[in-house]
UniProtKB/Swiss-Prot annotation:
GO biological-process terms attached to the record: positive regulation of transcription by RNA polymerase II
Protein name: Agamous-like MADS-box protein AGL86
Quaternary organization: Interacts with AGL61/DIANA and AGL62.
Coiled-coil intervals, chain numbering: 86-112
Length: 339
């Protein structure tokens, strides 16, 4: 990377002459590019102690350009005229403005720190003069005016803090959580609500005013927490040739073992239908001793093909307790279900 050249007279005569020769060629090349690309009139006269004065592009060209310049009004002639003295004066003015801007920014930063120290009670740590206190007072007034302007702007635009709705106050935990708690309804009509608020708290309405709660599932009996409901496969008999089954699901494990395990772990009768005679019989005797049809109600698959299997109609499932077999001969066994 080339270093910035210092604009001062070169002390060495040989170096000064070499620099003159190089820069003279550069100036003439730039003038040629300017006149060719932009279609303007330009000329240059370079006088030096090393050689005769250099005129570009020619003597006639210089006279023509000078004549066009002299025909201009005096104000236009001196409007963009730049000499060495005016160039230096322009640079000094620009640097002075930059210095004043930096001083103003530093003073504002210092006054801002003074203001925060006053708020925190740290004024005794600094030595303030009369001018500092006066500037601090003016800065605080200016800061307050800016805050008032911002508040008025937000108020006029309708974005004040009073326009926002109040926050929703819901207590998630409390001493009386459970009994009498207002529900958060997530199921259809008739479903047991899920209590998430304290006693007497208002429910969180999801649906419109006067509308039914947000239905996530169909209407059904109440379900307790951590309960497995038996899954009954839907097998239509009229369209058995058009049904394609996906990946297998072990319904026997969910129907047989899941519900009995849950029932066996329930000493406090927290599950529904505990007073039903049939449920008491199931809890008293293992399902191996009862003719439970679901023990054999599994869905057969053909050679492990779970995707393109056409399920035959399930006729007689309620009486036999078996799904129709895919073998050539089907043996029917009647199991007695105790009700």
């Amino acid at each position: 990377m080339r270093s910035k050249i210092k604009l001062s007279l070169i002390a060495n005569k040989t170096s000064r002459r070499t620099t003159f020769r190089k820069r003279k060629g550069g100036i003439t090349n730039k003038l040629h590019e300017l006149t060719t690309l932009c279609g303007v009139k330009a000329c240059a006269v370079i006088s030096s102690p090393y050689e005769n004065p250099v005129v570009w592009p020619s003597t006639e060209g210089v006279q023509e350009a000078v004549s066009m310049f002299m025909e201009r009004p005096a104000t236009e002639q001196s409007k963009l005229m730049m000499s060495h003295e005016t160039y230096l004066q322009d640079k000094i003015t620009k640097e002075t403005k930059k210095l004043e801007s930096l001083r103003r920014e530093n003073r504002e930063s210092q006054l801002r720190q003074f203001m925060f120290d006053c708020v925190e009670g740290k004024m005794s740590e600094h030595q303030y003069g009369a001018r500092d206190l006066q500037d601090l007072s003016l800065y605080i007034d200016h800061y307050i005016n800016q805050l008032n302007s911002s508040v008025m702007l937000l108020t006029n635009n309708g974005a004040s803090s009073s326009s926002f709705p109040p926050p929703l106050h819901t207590s998630v935990a409390g001493a009386g959580a459970g009994a009498g708690a207002a529900p958060l309804v997530v199921a259809g009509a008739g479903a047991a609500p899920l209590a998430v608020a304290g006693a007497g708290a208002s429910p969180l309405a999801v649906a419109g005013v006067g509308a039914a709660p947000l239905a996530v599932a169909g209407a059904g009996p109440p379900m307790a927490q951590n309960q497995y409901e038996p899954i009954q496969p839907y097998i239509p008999t009229a369209f058995s040739d058009n049904i394609q089954y996906q990946a297998p699901v072990d319904f026997n494990h969910q129907i047989q073992h899941g519900i009995y395990d849950n029932l066996s772990l329930d000493p406090n009768h927290q599950y529904p239908f505990q007073d039903d005679p049939f449920m008491e019989m199931l809890m008293e005797y293992p399902y191996e001793q009862v003719g439970y049809a679901a023990e054999h109600a599994h869905i057969p698959f053909m050679n492990g093909n779970y995707y393109n299997y056409h399920q035959p109609p399930t006729v007689g499932l309620t009486t036999t307790g078996h799904m129709p077999s895919n073998n050539a001969t089907t043996t029917t066994t009647t199991n007695t279900t105790v009700v």
